[in-house]
Amino acid sequence: IIYIMVYGYEAQRYLQWITENAFNICIAGTHGKTTVTSMVAHLLRHSGYGCNAFLGGISANYHTNFWSHERNVVVVEADEYDRSFLKLSPNIEVITSMDPDHLDIYGTAEEVENAFVQFSQKLKPGGTIVAKYGLSRAAELRADHLFNYDHQNEAADIHVKSLQVIEGSYHFTVQGPGWSIPNLVLHMGGLHNIDNMIAAITVAKQLDIDNDKIVAAVADYKGVRRRFEYALKTNEHVLIDDYAHHPDELKALLSGVRSIFPDRKLTLVFQPHLFSRTKDQAAGFSATLDLADEVILLPIYPARELPMEGVNSEMLLNNMQLN
């Protein structure tokens, strides 16, 4: 690690070196990859299967974003930024989404999609792809074992039945091709996180993990820091911290909150992330912000970028309907 720091090697190149001879489970997608990576790693660890894990966020179960294990299996978050995920060699891929993001790097939505198709082509022989149902380039994905998932669409290979919200938790059955797992309870909020969990469950099924162990692991899953994380939860007030920084992620967050707290006033405190993303996704952000009952807009967080003339939070406010 010191050698890498001194000579400036990027993280994904480092991951390429240390995973090239392992059985690799690589989680990609413009949305949800951190959560799904943590879910897969948790299912493997809790069930006793074992894995090495490189997460993009801090696991609420284990208070770390990395752990090691003697089993030569690696669960890794495959980051599309700068096409760095193309350096990995997956045995199992999960592709949660391929929506336009990082357009400062890719230029066009088509180039983002092209990168994900190229990522699918990195799959090792005999490998498996688990992809969100309805991806724009789904017809171009090729694998010996290919599954799609969508919790609310029975046309998907993996879907959900008997979904209920009971005391703030989701109770459901997952139906797959030739298998079914009832009595699942997910305590993490957000309907999108049901999708994320059934993707992780599909990976666990590919590894022949017992259903009972999957049920127990799902019930014990506590989430990832800043992904639908309850900072406060009382009878009077609920405060949720979430890293949602794309219109689709923000919409999923708000929908998830409504599914659990349908009769509560929803106040959204939102800080846009990156000037380029705010500019490229301005219309989507404004439309999504209108879904909240009350909105508090903070100045844009620039991260690695310099300010852009005319790109600011007021621009989003001016495009809102404010109904």
PLM ranges: what are they?
Residues 166-168, 176-294:
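Nucleotide phosphate-binding/pyrophosphate-handling subdomain across enzymes
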Residues 7, 111, 122-127, 252-261, ...:
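P-loop/Walker A phosphate-binding loop and immediately adjacent motor/lid segment at beta-alpha junctions
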Residues 1-12, 161-162, 189:
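N-terminal leader/targeting and accessory segments in enzymes
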Residues 1-2, 104-111, 277-279, 305-309:
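Glycine/threonine-rich flexible loop motifs
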